[in-house]
Amino acid sequence: MPRLMEDILPYARYRNPLNHMTVMFRKQDVLNAGNYRHFPYLEDYDLWSRMLAKGYAFYNLPEILVKARTSEALYERRGGAAYFRQYRQLRKEQHTLGLISGKEYATGCILSFGMTMQPSFLRKLTYQKVLRK
C-alpha cells in the first residue's frame, strides 16, 4: 500500500488506497464527509474517495498490522455483473468529485470489467500474482 499522500492520491484513482480493517479516523471527519453510505461491496472505497475529495490527509503505516485469511469465496464475491455495476458507479462518483479524469474513468471501467467478468480462478491469480506485488 502507498504510504504518503503524494502516492495515495494517484493509487486511489484505480484501487482502494486503505486496508479497511486497520483504519483509524476521527469520527467527525467521517461524518463531515457524509459518513458511510449504502454502496454494496465498496462502502469503504466510496467513503475514502469522498474524504480525499474534501482534502483529508491519509497515511498508511509501513508495518503489516493484520494478516487476513482468504478463501475461494472472496474471489467469487468480487466478480459478476452486480459487482461491476457498483465499481462503475464508484468511478462515476469519483469523476463527479474531480478525483479522476474522463480517461481514468474509462480506463478504470475497462479494468474493472476485466477483473469482475473473468472466471474466479483467473481473478484469484490476478490478485495473487499482479495486484499483491
Give residue spans per PLM region.
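Conserved short hydrophobic patches within well-ordered secondary structure
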Residues: 36, 68, 87, 110-111
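Anionic, Ser/Thr-rich low-complexity intrinsically disordered regions
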Residues: 23, 101-117
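Short, hydrophobic secondary-structure boundary micro-motifs
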Residues: 60, 103-104, 125
